[in-house]
Amino acid sequence: MTSADHVESAIAERREIVNEAVSEQLPVQKPERLYSASRYLLDAGGKRLRPTILLLAAESLADVEPLSADYRQFPSLPGDEVDVLSAAVSIEVIQSFTLIHDDIMDDDDLRRGVPAVHREYDLETAILAGDTLYSKAFEYMLDTGAPAERSVEALDELATTCTEICEGQALDVDFENRSDVTTEEYLEMVEFKTAVLYAAAASIPAILLGSDDETVEALHGYGLDIGRAFQIQDDLLDLTAPSDELGKQRGSDLVENKRTVITLHARDQGIDVEGLVSDDPSDAEIEAAVQTLEDAGSIDFAREMALDLVTSGKERLDVLPENEARQLLEDIADFLVERSY
């Protein structure tokens, strides 16, 4: 089995566990329309990558064989038991909350191959569903059974993460009306909008299980690094992957004039990025635009940045015991920049 296959298997195994926990902790109850809308995207699919990272970090910290311990009664370092699965559900429902509100702001029609929540239901219900998931996430983080001090610290991390996600989204909106965005500003936006939830997923188990500050900070840094690499790989795939694999038009970021590490680098090389493609480009036009970006070194620049971030993230895992769960966390970092979807 290749490392990619190993990662896919680890994610699939934990995805099933997390999906069952979501059904258990977020039942469709009265008012049914609200809770049906809240569950809608969670039931539509998703890799469950962030909760997988949380559960693997817990397994590595506790130095137990993967899937050998009950996630609902997980051994902490001081010797008490913590429900790390509830924390994993908390992280996943935050992810779903952000997707619902993102789709509203972008007026998108589809998400995960199904109509967006505001299309399937209505705008008011979608807003309420997102708000419900946001508040439920804090309930689930409190349900871990960790001692008060560790619970409060985990809640503080979750609250800070949610604030930063909103700040990142605000920066993204602001960038749409600016032509002078720098690469540094873009990476800050990516850190807040995308990477901080990976950082929370990696560091919260260390908080709940009673790890020292050095370990918490190292795992937080791991999450930030791989989260930024994840977004850069998404930017690369938009240009390099076929449309049928992407589930959207290849080069859509160019058509929509979105700021990415690639286009910002190209702009700095003197390329008229906004003029690379028309509003309804042909495949040949997209291919020519990608070649222009290749020739400018912009695609290689982004690839190298993503790989450097992954290397940095993996080095931060030195705080963990050498075990299979840690190796899987390293393999996930590689997977994020090697994936083709």
From Swiss-Prot:
Protein name: Geranylfarnesyl diphosphate synthase
Function description: Probably involved in biosynthesis of the precursor for C25 (sesterterpanyl chain) moiety of C20-C25 diether (2-O-sesterterpanyl-3-O-phytanyl-sn-glycer) membrane lipid. Catalyzes the condensation of isopentenyl pyrophosphate with the allylic pyrophosphates to yield geranylfarnesyl diphosphate (GFPP). Geranylgeranyl diphosphate (GGPP) is the preferred substrate, but dimethylallyl diphosphate (DMAPP) and farnesyl diphosphate (FPP) can also be used as allylic substrate.
A biological-process GO annotation: isoprenoid biosynthetic process
Sequence positions that bind an all-trans-polyprenyl diphosphate: R111, K193, T194, Q231
Cofactor binding note of this UniProt entry: Binds 2 Mg(2+) ions per subunit.
Predominant subcellular localization, coarse grouping: cytoplasm
GO molecular function annotations of the record: geranylfarnesyl diphosphate synthase activity; metal ion binding; prenyltransferase activity
InterPro entries, per database record: Isoprenoid_synthase_dom_sf, Polyprenyl_synt, Polyprenyl_synt_CS
Gene designation: idsA3
Catalytic activity: isopentenyl diphosphate + (2E,6E,10E)-geranylgeranyl diphosphate = (2E,6E,10E,14E)-geranylfarnesyl diphosphate + diphosphate
Binding residues for Mg(2+) 2: D102, D106
Keyword set includes Hydrolase: no
EC assignment: 2.5.1.81
